[in-house]
Structures are given as structure tokens and as C-alpha cells.
């Protein structure tokens, strides 16, 4: 665009940024999962929660102080709605508590274990539970039961889930009164959004054969500042034992405009090889 050309032709250009979405997940868990719930709106689609097919914004509903006429969230159509993850039926009260606790239960066709869980609640309207119970069972016997207090719509639960074949999530209280429970996305593992403060360096290479006798090869390497020592093999509660190939790595390039805003441009999507080098201090990891 003309604006982009004008900005990039300046003698002194504004800084650029890199953002990487990376984590340790179980890529086979969605295939084994069978999610159910205890009540939902007609356009709710619980089956899409763990496969990444939800819509970027939620529909407007007649919940108090939620119906905002800003054009960002559309009304649900009478036919052919866009299914957008889990949208519960029960609305919380004046104090944010639910009389009937919204429940999402996921049964697995085999035993699974996770280094943690990553939840995406309602980003578009800022709705999330500020009291949230996670229960894991193995053959109907409880092996994990904790109540948390999330403080954001994109929330990582970093406690390890032991071997189990059933997960249950209970919405106990909403951060905003008179709101439904919503869950747009669930990842079986820990997914971090790495920014400039977390990345020490990164590089991208691409090999293309001019005769097209070989498949093009593209590699992306990055070094992160691992202050929590998640990838340190000497950390018994870290993620080292869960590292494997086929972990998705999404990276974007950002350019800062003169008004201070940052435009993010998709750079690439690749998958990890499972290799990770950690410095002697355990504070820097190269992936």
C-alpha cells in the first residue's frame, strides 16, 4: 500500500518485531476426545473446541451489558449460524455465581497425560471465569482436582495432568456478572505467545531447487529466554519429557507505524523437529 511504501522509504525506519506462538501439546488428543456439556445455545459446537475451527468473534446475545452496538460482534442468524465453540445456557447472577454450574466433560478413547492446558475464553467481549474447577479421572477415579482463578481470556494452566481418560471443567463464577460460559478453544498442552522480551534471536532459511527436482525446504530456528526453565532437562517439573516432533510453530513479523500501532504480517507456519538445546544455565533454549 501507499502507506507501507511511505513508511519503509524513510531514512530512519521504525522498529520491527517478531511474535512466535509455540508450545508443547498432544497432537493426537483431539482425535481421541469425545466432548459433551450440560446445556448450550443452538449454535454452540462443543466438538470444535479442541480442533481449532472456532470463529474469531462471538455472537451478540441478550446478556446484561453485553449487547453493544459497535458492529464487532454480529447477531446470530436464524439459519446456518457459524459454530463457535462452547456457549453455555446458564447465565450467572449478580455476584457472578452460577446456580447450575456450566460443565464441559471430555472423555478420551485412550489414556492421556498433559504438561498443562491452554484455554481461550471469549476474547472479543473479555468474558472468562474467575473461578474455574478442573477435574481429571482415570477409570472414574479422581487423579486431579483443583480450582483456579483465571485472570485473562487466554489462560495457561501449567500444572501437569497425570494419566487419565476423562477431563471435566466447571465454571463456578464469571468475571462479569450476568454472562454465559464460553470456551472458544482448548489446547491439550501449554502454548505460549512469545514476544520481543522472550526471544533472544530467530532465523529463517528457505532452499528452492531451480530445476524443481527437490521439494522446497524451509527452516525456522529461534532462541527463547526460558526464565521459568520449562525446557531445562534438570527441572523435574519442566516440559522436557513432553518435547516431540509435530509441535506447531506459528511466527509473525510486526512493523511499527508512526502512530505507534503495530501491524502483524504472517511469516510462516512450521512444525518442530523435537530437538531443543538448552544453555548450561538453563535460562536459554534453542528450538
Question: PLM features: what roles do these ranges have?
Answer:
Residues 1-287:
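Assembly/oligomerization scaffold segments
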